[in-house]
Amino acid sequence: MAKEKFDRSKPHLNIGTIGHVDHGKTTLTAAITTTLAKLVGGKNKAIAYDQIDNAPEEKARGITIATSHQEYETPNRHYAHVDCPGHADYVKNMITGAAQMDAAILVVSATDGAMPQTKEHILLARQVGVPYIVVYLNKADMLAADERDDMVEMVKEEIKDLLNKYNFPGDKTPFISGSALKALEGEDSDLGMKSILKLMEAVDTYVPNPTRIVDKPFLMPVEDVFSITGRGTVATGRVEQGVLKINDEIEIVGIRDTTKSVVTGIEMFRKLLDQAEAGDNIGALLRGTKKEDIERGQVLAKPGTITPHRKFKAEVYVLTKDEGGRHTPFFNNYRPQFYFRTTDITGVCNLPGGMEMVMPGDNVTMSIELIHPIAMDQGLKFAIREGGRTIGSGVVAEIVE
């Protein structure tokens, strides 16, 4: 059967459900697909709860993660939605960036309020750079009708405070209360399907369209460098974001002092191009740059858009023995290699105060100092390796210097 063509006419957004276990994340995911299929139609298909719950395990950077991917659309947008069955899957998913989220729907049970994983997921969202959160207060049908408004208001205030604490704008965040179960059962009431439409309306209006990857400033990690006699030095790699045109000025950033050059030629598959864009594997001919002035692990970037750093804080997941990770814990001042984009750089781990060691399977916030600076900004993913094998995965949460 011929595959259906992906419709690019609508803006696309990656979204996911986050929140405490049993607060109704998976039920809400099923309710969204079901409600949109019934009331909006189009290409929307209702996906049953157990189809989402029996999420297939997939490997991302060697780590096994169970995630379910659904798609749906509103009149304005196309959404790819990720839902994880287990808490550990969420942690791994957010840190490895297996499913990059442009926004998250935080599901909170109106009967319980904030629980430990509610906080943990908000913190993770902040650390890994999820830019927007919309809140769905679920299970509102379980509250007595005469107390419902007061209880919902109370939970709302509590969640607002939590969002503010982790630098999300709690007072601007949309809150929708309802019952994902009632919506899933097809009940067309304020708590049922109408609450789902309200939720999607809030996501449509509150979350802006993400910047397309080609509209971001040019960046290309250098994979290889060679010189062509009589022409100069060529740096090869895959364009990560943005567009590169001939005669563009670029900076070479990372490992050494930042230098500038001009791109005098762009080649792809031995053909000359006028420009290259995100996703292209290219060779860029650099004017006046010697082969020994540039190396793998640096990046070519639009001037002034990225800076090199050695010290940063990171959110890290340490692989278990079964995932091919370490069999034993590691301690403060552990010195592994950090694999950024195309190269390994040695660095030192400083564990948070009071923490003696990190066990395989742990998720931890740590400070890292590299021996050479690397071009980085918040949200950059990396692997932690020992002798070439991956023992952890991390994301830059904050740059220190």
Curated annotation (Swiss-Prot):
G2: region residues: 62-66
Annotated ranges, domain tr-type G: 10-211
Region spans: G1: 19-26
Region of interest (G3), residue spans: 83-86
Domain of life: Bacteria
Function: GTP hydrolase that promotes the GTP-dependent binding of aminoacyl-tRNA to the A-site of ribosomes during protein biosynthesis.
Protein's name according to its UniProt entry: Elongation factor Tu
UniProt source species: Leptospira biflexa serovar Patoc (strain Patoc 1 / ATCC 23582 / Paris)
Gene that specifies this protein: tuf
